[in-house]
Swiss-Prot record:
InterPro entries: Glyco_trans_2-like, Nucleotide-diphossugar_trans, PGA_PgaC/IcaA. It is a multi-pass membrane protein. It comes from Staphylococcus epidermidis. It is found in: Cell membrane. Belongs to the glycosyltransferase 2 family. The gene is icaA. Its EC number is 2.4.1.-. It comes from the Bacteria. This is Poly-beta-1,6-N-acetyl-D-glucosamine synthase. The keyword Signal does not apply. One of its GO terms (biological process) is cell adhesion involved in biofilm formation.
């Protein structure tokens, strides 16, 4: 009976936790700071930022990203782009672009993964603060100012992660992911921030303190998701990570089922790799915030496998001629579906209300509010089934290379 209660109520509990955490974070930590009030004076002293752009087969997007960073008003900056052995004409495009623009270019011959590319790029960084961007990303002009200001206020910060938005919204998948980032992922980051530890920075857009990266050994070349891995290392070394929702960037997301599936399996595998690697180190820290974060990861994996076992049991023992059995099963299904739908409506309403100060058009996402979070749990369950065995087979000490990304329909 206890297992059944966990199966039924865990998603509901987590949704309520995200809702309450988001509301509290918004009114206490987010709303008091109006995103429109930011002083940018020519005489204002700012810390220098080294922008790192690691890319692999980004011939269609890299020029847009370079142009975006070069055009930023941020006064003290340098740009370092790393080509990680691309098999397309990415290197040629960068060399041609460099003829008329000032930036550093590290051209690696062999694809050894994003983490290795970032490790090579940071060797060229002149400043204490390092902004890591994906090569399909366009950032708002205000974003670096918001993020660097957070470091001034809190010397314990090791990283400030921004608020990614979706550029390509022409397809159904693009629209769904737009709402997902605005609601579910935003809720999770806000609630985790309150607990004191964020599971992962946004690999697409984060500002690091270089000395903090040096302390933790920079990025791990053998972890499939370098962003999750470095996030946990920062926590273990007593650095804090801040979520800065006012710092916006615009990125491309997969617009094919295959591309989206591959991305989500990689994310889940990376999270599981980190959990397996850092489990005992986390236990030894005796930090409640990390215990909460680790419990959330373990509980999610456990929930998935309980679902599999329970559904298998139902199929094996089902008696379609037993009216009492069918009535009981239908009652449980109806209750859980009604409860989840009700919670989903509240979660989406709260999340999209909060998000409307950054992107008002997302309010149309209300049409998804009765069903998408439920689908989110189903997708995550399927992803975990594929990803966890992969994480168990991770080869230590190698290079987690990357493949050509699915960037969807690029909208300029």
């Amino acid at each position: 009976m206890h297992i059944f209660n966990f199966l039924l109520f865990y998603p509901i509990f987590m949704s309520i936790y995200w809702i309450v955490g988001s509301i509290y974070y918004f009114f206490i930590k987010e709303k008091p700071f109006n995103r429109l009030l930011l002083v940018k004076s020519e005489h204002q002293q700012v810390e220098g930022i080294s922008f790192l752009l690691a890319c692999y087969n980004e011939s269609e997007t890299v020029q847009d990203t370079l142009s975006s960073v070069l055009s930023l008003e941020y006064p003290e900056k340098e740009i370092i782009i790393i080509n990680d052995g691309s098999s397309d004409n990415t290197a040629e495009i960068i060399y041609e672009f460099k003829k008329n623009h000032d930036f550093k270019f590290v051209d690696l011959e062999v694809n050894r993964g994003k983490a290795n590319a970032l490790n090579e790029g940071i060797k060229q960084a002149s400043y204490e603060y390092v902004m890591c961007l994906d090569a399909d990303t366009v950032i708002d002009d205000d974003a670096p100012f918001y993020m660097i200001e957070d470091f001034k206020k809190n010397p314990k910060l090791g990283a400030v992660t921004g608020n990614p938005r979706i550029r390509n919204k022409s397809s159904i998948l693009g629209k769904i992911q737009t709402i997902e980032y605005a609601s579910i992922i935003g809720c999770i980051k806000r609630s985790q921030s309150l607990a004191g530890a964020i599971n992962t920075i946004s690999g697409v857009f984060t500002l690091f303190k270089k000395s903090a990266l040096k302390d933790v050994g920079y990025w791990d070349t053998d972890m499939i998701t370098e962003d999750i891995a470095v996030s946990w290392k920062l926590h273990l070394f007593d650095y804090e990570i801040k979520y800065e929702p006012r710092a916006l960037c615009w990125m491309l997301v997969p617009e094919t089922i295959g591309g989206l599936w591959k991305q989500r399996v990689r994310w889940a595998q990376g999270g599981h790799e980190v959990l397996l690697r850092d489990f005992w180190s986390t236990i030894k820290t005796k930090k409640l915030s990390l215990y909460i974060l680790m419990f959330e990861q373990i509980a999610s994996i456990t929930w998935v496998y309980i679902v599999i076992c329970y559904l298998s049991f139902l199929v094996i023992t089902a008696n379609i001629l037993d009216y009492t059995y069918l009535k009981y099963s239908f009652s449980i299904f109806f209750f859980s579906s009604f409860t989840m739908t009700f919670i989903n409506i509240i979660q989406f309403t709260v999340a999209l209300f909060i998000d409307s100060r950054y992107e008002k058009k997302n309010i149309v996402g209300l049409i998804f509010l009765s069903w998408y979070p439920t689908l989110y749990w189903v997708i995550n369950a399927a992803v975990v089934i594929m990803a966890f065995p992969k994480a168990l087979k991770r080869k230590k000490g190698g290079y987690a290379t990357w493949s050509s990304p699915d960037r969807g329909n690029i909208q300029r």
